[in-house]
Structures are given as C-alpha cells and as structure tokens.
Amino acid sequence: MKRPLACAGFLYLVIQLLAAFLPPAAFGPLAAVFLAAVFPAWKLGGRFRTHAVLACTVTGAALLLRMAAFTWMMAPIQARAGTQAEIHAAVVETSPGFLEDTVRAGVLVDEVNGMAVRPFRVYFLSLPQALPGECFSARVEFAELEENEYTYGNYADGIFLAGEYLDGFLPQGESGALWARAKRVQAALSMALRKVLAQPYAGAAAAMTAGDRALLTDEVKDAFRGAGLSHVLVVSGLHLSAVGGLVYAAVRRMGRRRLACACAMFSSLAFMCLTGFTPSVVRAGTAMLLLYGGALFNRKSDALTSLGLAALLLCLQNPYAAVDVSLLLSFSATLGVLWVTAEHRRWRAGSAAQGKNAAR
C-alpha cells in the first residue's frame, strides 16, 4: 500500500467527523464490530487485504477513542451544568465584551470549591476585564452550551460547558504554563503594534502576525467577512512557511545545511506554540517538520503523508477537532491544491512525451 500513514490519517478524520452525528451509545458496539472484522478482512481480503485490515483497524480504534473521549472527557464536564461553585481558573483567550470593562473569555478551570480537578475549559459571555494567561478566582454558575452555529467550534476547542459569572472576582497572578507564556509573548507583540498603529489596524495586524485576536473588534471581523477575506485574520501555513524559509535561508548562507534544517524545525515549533497550535498552523507545521526533518536525515518528504499525519495528530489530541469547519476547509483546500498540482504535472509530462514523439 502506498502512503499508509496518509490513508490512516484521512480515514481517522472522516470517522471522527461521522461519529459527531452518532449517539454515544453506538460507539462501543460499532467499534467492536469493526475490530472483530480485522481477522476476516485479513483472511478474505485477497489483493486488498491490507486496505481492508487498515480500514477496519483505524475505524475501530477511532470509535473506541471517541467513546473514551465522551466517557472520560466530555460527560463528566457537562454533568456540572446547573451547579454553582467557587473556581480558580486561568484565562486562555478573550474578545471584547458587550459591556464596558468586560470580556468574552474561554478559561481553563483547575480548582472547584477549593479542590483540584482535572483542568477543563469553560466559555463566559461576560467576565470582568482580564488578559490571557492571568489567573483568577470567582463564584460562577455552570450551564450547558447553547445549540447554535458555534457549538461544534466550541467542541473542537475543547469547550463543553458555559459559565455565568456571579461575583467575587479576584485576580490570582499569572499562570506559569507554557501556553500562558506564549500568550504573554503574543500580548507583548500586540502591545508593540498598538504603539505603532492605531485601532482597528493594530488589532488586524496582531491577528495576522501573532495570532492574537483579542484586539479584533466585531466591526473589523464583519468587514473582512463581508469581503470574503476572514481567513486573512487567522495565522496560517503561509506565515509559518515564510518564517521557516527565512530562518533556513539565513542559516544556510553559513554553509551548514543540516544546521539550517534543525533551526528551521525549531522555528516552526516555536511559531506553532506562539499561535496556540491552530489547525491551519499545525497542518503546515507538520508538513514543515517532515520537510526539514527529511532533509536533515537525507530523506524526501511527501505532502500527502504530512497532511494525513497532521489530521491524525489534531484528532488524537481532541476527537472533536474533526467537526471544526476551519480544519475541514483547510484540509479540503490543501487536498485540492495537491490534486490539481499532480494532474498538472501529469498533463505536462504527457504533453512533453507527445511532443517528442511528434518530433520523431
């Protein structure tokens, strides 16, 4: 089989997408059916036995992992809906609130009523002014997420619960986690841009260069959306490719090819961390790591394999990432570009061969 890793990654993505429309009770039985079909597929598959075994194995494993994610990740969090609690949390991301001195925020809760819990994310429509990376304590009420066009996007971000702020907001310093430090670097870059540019230009520039969308206003978002350019406000593979390419070119001038590859890989990882591992950046980052990693060890990278691996990595860390519209559009567009490129090369090769035959 050609490109087994790519096939496994794309199949895993498709299965997790389809699983979003299945009742949770169906995950276990369906997983058992597909895993039980592995041996018959190997015995009766004939020339396609490898494909059949891979399909059954990946499908069964994907459904098992989806069942585990629902049982141990999603259900316990959603069970808190309707309860009030004193929480300790760190702000992950913010956007301007509807009222003065408030923000809409996604927070990471690590303590409930004074007891440490497995961290989980909650979305607040209104929270007192806070910055990403800052910790706070407050009394809140948990609630179920509203069923709307943003529901699957919240699931893809690991948010399964909404929160309503009640009272007692008290800042608790800054988080020392890696993601929080990356957020502070983002904030520093945004502050530097704010000193040079006025709003709304500073917010748009920060979103396009550092992935910091905190300064984006609804008017700017609506304007870009109306022009069909909302994707420009998101850090994408273009930015990552430019950073990695510039680092590689700068170090390569010293005559150290392997050192240049290693530096480009490090810069790609650092940029992925800075932008919060968004789907488009992870997809491009995986491709860049395979490209420079292959060059580092004198191996040739493959675009489809890197794309399939990126899909697998994104959905392994959160199976609900498969329902993210931006992820699906990003992968679909990349697959389309790869297919058109391959067809164009095949057409050029055929035209060149016909030209040589005609010349004879």
PLM-predicted stretches and their roles:
Residues M1-Q78:
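N-terminal leader/targeting segments
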Residues G114-A130:
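Beta-strand/loop nucleic-acid-binding surfaces
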Residues M1-P4, K43-H51, R252-L259, A295-T305:
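Membrane-helix interface "capping/anchor" motifs
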Residues G9-L17, V33-F39, A242-Y248, A264-M272, ...:
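Hydrophobic, membrane-inserted alpha-helices
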Residues G9-L13, P24, F277-R360:
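Internal transmembrane alpha-helical bundles of multi-pass membrane proteins
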